[in-house]
UniProtKB/Swiss-Prot annotation:
Family under the similarity heading: Belongs to the expansin family. Expansin B subfamily.
Tissues expressing the protein: Expressed in pollen (at protein level).
UniProt protein name: Expansin-B1
Keywords assigned: Allergen, Cell wall, Cell wall biogenesis/degradation, Disulfide bond, Glycoprotein, Secreted, Signal
Biotechnology: This protein has potential use in diagnosis and specific immunotherapy (SIT) of grass pollen allergy for patients living in a subtropical climate. The diagnostic sensitivity and specificity is 92.4% and 93.1%, respectively, for the detection of Bahia grass pollen (BaGP) allergy in patients that have sensitivity level of 0.23 kU/l of IgE for this protein. The immunodominant T cell epitopes may be suitable for safe SIT for individuals with severe allergic symptoms to BaGP.
Disulfide bridge partners, by residue number: 65-93, 96-162, 101-106
Keyword Transcription (UniProt): no
Localization, UniProt: Secreted, Cell wall
Source organism: Paspalum notatum (Bahia grass)
Annotated region described as Immunodominant T cell epitope, given as residue ranges: 123-142, 177-196, 240-259
Length: 265
């Protein structure tokens, strides 16, 4: 076979592979969105892990929810990237799940993880890409590293209510770049459902106005007219519960600043 014929033959083979979708494992469509149906039923999923073996996942201890320092309390590195029906375009940020595995190295005891990041690997209807610490925590004592050597395996999961120790209240972080005409806030440490489906803002002497979900757990308000502080925030959880953080953002608010509320679900 001449060189030109060889090139044509190779090109034909490559085209057939691409057309037939033969590159890589088959894609699995995502399952239905996980809701606040706390019925205790365990569901099947795939588990992987990333980052440092005993780390919180991302090297910057952050993630697609916008939450930072997930290696520190109250998350303590027990975090996970959820695939689309778990992450839900950011509306799953902060939700909590129990996970357990049944390998010989597994303890069989459930481990609770917080959703702080996303993954779009189409390997299963439900997929948890766990921090190394959370993955290893499913093991029997002393077998953490051996369990992590699997890299990927089947597990069971169920959604649970989020619980924070020590009377932790909801916290708001006014994001960098915020100004009187653009206000962006990260909300974190939400108990019970853990996630928020609606965030509303009330200026001084005004009515409630809905904010827009910007990305992850960050909500924003854009307005041509300067916002007048102090700002109250009303949160609605996935199950419809509401709390109001009255005047939580003060008159002299600043961007890139944390404001603690005195409310919790």
């Amino acid at each position: 076979m001449g060189s030109l014929a060889k090139i044509v033959a190779v090109a034909a083979v490559l085209a057939a592979l691409v057309a037939g979708g033969s590159c890589g494992p088959p894609k699995v469509p995502p399952g239905p969105n996980i809701t606040t149906n706390y019925n205790g039923k365990w569901l099947p999923a795939k588990a992987t892990w990333y980052g440092q073996p005993n780390g919180a996942g991302p090297d910057d201890n952050g993630g697609a929810c916008g939450i930072k320092n997930v290696n520190l309390p109250p998350y303590n590195g027990f975090t996970a990237c959820g695939n689309p029906p778990i992450f839900k375009d950011g509306k799953g940020c902060g939700s909590c799940y129990e996970i357990r595995c049944n390998k010989p190295e597994c303890s069989g005891q459930p481990v609770t993880v917080f959703i702080t990041d996303m993954n779009y690997e189409p390997i299963a209807p439900y997929h948890f890409d766990l921090s190394g610490k959370a993955f290893g925590a499913m093991a029997k004592p002393g077998l953490n590293d051996k369990l992590r050597h699997y890299g990927i395996f089947d597990l069971e999961f169920r959604r649970v209510r989020c619980k924070y120790q020590g009377g932790q209240k909801i916290v708001f972080h006014v994001e960098k770049g915020s100004n009187p005409n653009y206000l962006a806030m990260l909300v974190k440490f939400v108990a019970d459902d853990g996630d928020i489906v609606l965030m509303e803002l009330k200026e001084k002497s005004s009515d409630w106005k809905p904010m827009k979900l910007s990305w992850g757990a960050i909500w924003r308000m854009d307005t041509p007219k300067a916002l007048v502080p102090p700002f109250s925030i009303r949160l609605t959880s996935e199950s419809g519960k509401k709390v109001i953080a009255q005047d939580v953002i003060p008159v002299n608010w600043k961007p890139d600043t944390v404001y603690n509320s005195n409310v919790q679900f």
